[in-house]
């Protein structure tokens, strides 16, 4: 018994020493932000990291409620999916709130992504190994991604706080941060997407280096969705129940529109027409099969099995 006690003490001591060594990091071998943006490879890797925050929309745990709404998942064995299907998903059943969401947690994830995108935009011009055109395109990618992540927050939480081009202040107190209004959020998001679209390429010329990266159609297509989202009654006067009309910020300013603006529907339609007028996207048809029945079958199958086709505007590989 005494021997066993000594063995246990010895192992615990080794564990303590290991933890001590593990926690003693040497930060001298880590790159500064200036060093990151001094080289092409590290600058490109920083941009690639921004793409890493794009949600997996097939995964309900990555802020996608689509799998919860049908039989994509067997909801009986997935408690949170069943809550959505039964209409019982709310704060009291899941503990959902802004800074801590056990299952659907985009809050901290997207604000980290937003801050990293702003950092990229602020420093990309320091990389002289990239041409001026390359820097402008990469900056447009980051600008679109930042707006897209703001939109994902807006979809779940409504009006949120906008940092604009300011890098996040870690010392700022939460009580001094106030929500922007719905119109301010939508106006910023859609303008950022529109501005990015003016620079991004219309089509993917080199699939080996550009596949999966954002294009003009991606930016305009997502902008169209943003404006359509903002035109719906929930964010456009609150419908017959006046949803959100009583919500104000700390200054007493209403954060939801107080009445319906029909022009928002017109703006959403015009945004969708801009995507159509690109003349890039169309229904996919199999190009090799001659039998009409097999051609129809293969055309439908290839929409899901081919890595890229004419119907895809934004895609993420799995």
Which positions does each model-derived feature cover?
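A solvent-exposed, charged loop/short amphipathic helix patch at secondary-structure junctions
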Residues: 237-258
């Amino acid at each position: 018994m005494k021997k066993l006690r000594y063995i246990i003490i010895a192992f615990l001591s080794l564990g303590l020493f290991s933890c001590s060594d593990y926690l003693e990091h040497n930060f001298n071998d880590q790159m500064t932000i200036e060093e990151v943006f001094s080289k092409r490879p590290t600058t490109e890797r920083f941009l690639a990291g921004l793409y890493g925050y794009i949600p997996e929309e097939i995964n309900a745990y990555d802020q996608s409620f689509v799998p919860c709404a049908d039989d994509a998942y067997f909801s009986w064995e997935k408690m949170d999916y069943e809550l959505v299907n039964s209409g019982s998903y709310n704060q009291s059943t899941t503990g959902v709130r802004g800074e801590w969401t056990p299952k659907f947690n985009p809050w901290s994830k997207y604000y980290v992504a937003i801050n990293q995108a702003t950092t990229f935009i602020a420093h990309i011009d320091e990389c002289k190994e990239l041409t001026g055109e390359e820097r402008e395109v990469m900056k447009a990618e980051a600008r679109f991604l930042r707006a897209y992540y703001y939109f994902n927050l807006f979809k779940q939480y409504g009006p949120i706080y906008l940092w604009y081009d300011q890098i996040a202040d870690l010392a700022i107190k939460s009580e001094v941060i106030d929500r922007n209004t719905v119109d301010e959020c939508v106006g910023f998001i859609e303008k950022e997407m529109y501005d990015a679209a003016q620079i991004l390429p219309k089509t993917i010329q080199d699939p080996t280096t550009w596949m999966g990266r954002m294009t003009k159609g991606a930016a305009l297509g997502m902008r169209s969705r943003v404006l359509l989202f903002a035109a719906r009654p929930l964010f456009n006067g609150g419908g017959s129940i006046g949803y959100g009309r009583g919500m104000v910020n700390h200054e007493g300013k209403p954060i939801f529109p107080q009445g319906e603006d029909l022009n928002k529907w017109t703006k959403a339609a015009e945004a969708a027409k801009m995507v159509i007028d690109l003349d890039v996207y169309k229904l996919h048809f199999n190009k090799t099969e001659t039998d009409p029945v097999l051609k129809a079958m293969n055309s439908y199958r290839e929409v899901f099995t081919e890595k890229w086709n004419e119907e895809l505007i934004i895609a993420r590989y799995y």
